[in-house]
């Protein structure tokens, strides 16, 4: 006893906390030194000591023991401030949504992690004996993550799809959650008892599947003789030292270990604690160890590959069922995983960037040649360095050198002054390059309604030429110009509110007056609905029930921001007038009714064709408008013909028309005379019962089918086609010619008037009008001739551009003209289908836009058509206007044509605005509760889109110091320009005035100046409409601002409406600060006064102020998908843009058991890295280049299987270690070996042994290939544990697992033999279990200790031993390969 006391005095006292992990190490070392019996005695004493201390301490847990962190308040406040700053950047359009999401996640994750660290310090300093602190710190109950959520903050959560929610839960469970935080928390959190009950059954089922896979794995041999192994090294940075020790202890070396010439460990040596310490001390090379993954046994395992037994320190005994032990070891912690994920489910865990901070104050010096500017993943400007970079910080006394790692972002500029501890760089080089990434799509929704505008960086996807899917070629802004979009209501009610600036015109046929706008909207609606639309011929009023009648366009000018009535398609008024309105068309009555009284052409509207895109782009030789003359209209079916028997001089001309801006040619015939042959046509279903026969004669009102009667009498022709029956009735005369009559040449031809023809009574008569002669042959021997009347149409060219439009007093453009062409719409001899309810148009008068391409022009071939309305007191005039544009994709300065739906009044009608607004009232409109309605092309079939632009959507920038701060700065002009072209600009509320800022109607000139002057004389307009002597600034196409001198020569073009300055001396060029149509971001300094308070588009530029239409910018990255068309109306919540980006799959969003099951069942991930294919190709080329083509392929396949197995083991271990569960790698390796041991025979090489598609063992395939001396083509597959359980060598084991009937019937048909090698099949049949004591009768004792000494090494010397080992296989491969 005294000696023992003396020894205790010499012992070292360790004052450390003994947690669960330390206890495990202590017990393991006690077993190594003292054995099992003495260790159990020591553990009993430790247990007694623990019970005594716990009883004396009397630890209890209460709600007051949950101490919150004092610094949480200002930490959360600081994070909120950073998030608010970044939210402002996003609002300004400086960063896009993905960058904002990344920054928000990292801000809150860093805050949460800092709170976690503060939690430990707070407990140690304030209450070190706190029960919560004792429990989680000792590892007895809970972990740091759970306690952090109790007393810190829950942080970021994931939604059910695994995506991060950028709104963090700032509260902890001690403080309580708000309603929003509770709903977010419920997305990913487990729900206690319910979750435990469900997951417990899942854990049991997982254990059953695991045991089913490996139940036949028993130790049956001492050494399998393999030369393979897994290389483990503690110095490659991939494995911590503690994990390295746990991996090596209990293993067996696969090769000798040398340090220089000295051998410190031999092959097949058991690795203990002492040997591991020697490896660490001597810094040995990578160590090759034997694992179950490399064991050569097919249905069992050897002692050396398994290693030390988990119960004692020696090698595992023969006959031990290590497979069942492995399944139990992995499945048993399943219940613990379920319970442990109660508080951690759904909480985001990730990594942040490593920051490099400045050691002191000073000036930064770096080599700018080694870096290039870029943009960080958070949207900050930075410099990227791909190699190591040394940064020098020059302080007053000393120079500090900071080493920046490669692939880092430098956040400071050269020669910039930095403060101590300021972040100068961030590095993400520590992340693995082979991290799994998933492709994520993030949709950005519109915050408010408005119009979509974009820059020239948007182009159509090739497969979506006519769709609304666009891609971005480079980073640019998308703008939503604010408005209040709304759909037309289902009832014909007014959408205007009180005090809205508007005017309503409705066309009354009988009274020919405009209904006045009443004070209430209901009265106005009643007057509109009661308008008389029953037109009479004597009044020469158009029939509004026809196609394309009463749709009009209204442009809103600067002086009168007024609108026309917007009518709903479903209302009775709208359905009568516009029931058959075609898409992308609108009609403008350009002439009044009185002007057409003395002309042959009846009053009708002209249908304007607008392309489907928002800008209304027309191309050369395209139809701009068309007019349907009622003289060429028929109500019955028939066919048209152009040629005659004797007259073949009919002029034929083919024009190819560009349709909708693409090279789609449609042939239209231009003729002088054509003939229409009427007939009655009925299209019947194939199953109809016809009551008349083919080639029979019927009368009027004859019963054709059960519910159909004929309208005319004549010859019946019945033709049966696929699923329909076409029945025609030809009316005319039947003529039976004699045998000598030569009638064949007159078959199906036209006979002009004056030609003699014979009748059935042998008499000759002269034809008075054109007739159609057609030979009918009902049988081979009989025939007769059908003579039908023909309607002749002479196409008169009486409709010209002068007829449709007022005469042009100014000269036209030399290289552009409008031609009126009559086109026949139907081909010769082709049938025209119609009925008696609707009419058929035979000829269409088209207004074709022609270009003379021989002469040089300042413009490209594209043009844009619109209609301008000029209003003065009581007179309204509409003009067709064509603007030439540069390119179809150049949308800068272009706006969607605002189309109004309603009826236009005549010139003599009363106008609701009796008091014109003065110049002062114009500017006041922006500050009152008044608005203007914009309507757009009806792309939605269900409802009409429109946008209300009110004063709340505009912002006015007044000068800070009076007139001193103008928007333009005068400069002296140095160069001479013969002609300065002034491009069209956007007006304040949607109009298109040709002058940049026009405050009066004097500058809204049309192409008919005399007509405008007459208007002014009629209205006795006084000074507001006289010539002003104010300064006006024009914007040229090069975005230069020019000051116009009214005394200079000014030429105004007819169809162009561009201003051309003929003399350069008459204007002074200035530099622009704000240009019309320019988009301005919020708080961006433009002049010296002050930055704009809101983002928007400049819609009015004046000398002393600027009006901005508010807009919301969205920054989009290359590859993003833009939804919708340019100028399209968006509603709040509509998808504007979709981002496609990659993100790393977060560590454990799916916690616990589901994650383990996902890996073990080998379920595919949602998506992999987009550049993974390139990595694999590069890796394969590298191996092939080093080892040659045949060897490279073989070794590449081998390494792929080995690396995949190791990766699976690491994945499973990662999940368990995250939950604090430690499982030895050997158990997981046995499971992974079984699910990766099968290969699929491919069809490339047909073998006589295996059939294509058969699953066989990997080792069996290799041995068969060596025995047959021919390669077997196969590919490795990963089977899940369920599928692996149904693909074993025992059909009895498979049938007892699941699908019993299928497995047994398939085994009976295939004649399978069960060799009863596993444990389960012997239990089922009542045999001796081949494990434990039953193992001795199964294996010959002489073979138990038979070893195969091999001095080969797989992973040393460039894998030469592998090639030697498979020399026969390689020789056969080389012999069979083509030379």
From Swiss-Prot:
Keywords: DNA-directed RNA polymerase, Metal-binding, Nucleotidyltransferase, Plastid, Transcription, Transferase, Zinc. It catalyses: RNA(n) + a ribonucleoside 5'-triphosphate = RNA(n+1) + diphosphate. GO terms for biological process: DNA-templated transcription. The keyword Heme does not apply. Pfam families: RNA_pol_Rpb1_4, RNA_pol_Rpb1_5. PANTHER family: DNA-DIRECTED RNA POLYMERASE SUBUNIT BETA. It comes from the Eukaryota. It is found in: Plastid. Its EC number is 2.7.7.6. Its cofactor is Zn(2+). Residues 503-524 are annotated as: Disordered. Belongs to the RNA polymerase beta' chain family. RpoC2 subfamily. One of its GO terms (molecular function) is DNA-directed RNA polymerase activity. Zn(2+) binds at residues 224, 295, 302, 305. One of its GO terms (cellular component) is plastid. InterPro entries: DNA-dir_RpoC2_beta_pp, RNA_pol_beta''_euk, RNA_pol_Rpb1_3_sf, RNA_pol_Rpb1_4, RNA_pol_Rpb1_5, Rpb1_funnel_sf. In plastids the minimal PEP RNA polymerase catalytic core is composed of four subunits: alpha, beta, beta', and beta''. When a (nuclear-encoded) sigma factor is associated with the core the holoenzyme is formed, which can initiate transcription. Binds 1 Zn(2+) ion per subunit. This is DNA-directed RNA polymerase subunit beta''. It comes from Cuscuta exaltata (Tall dodder). The lineage of its organism: Eukaryota, Viridiplantae, Streptophyta, Embryophyta, Tracheophyta. DNA-dependent RNA polymerase catalyzes the transcription of DNA into RNA using the four ribonucleoside triphosphates as substrates.
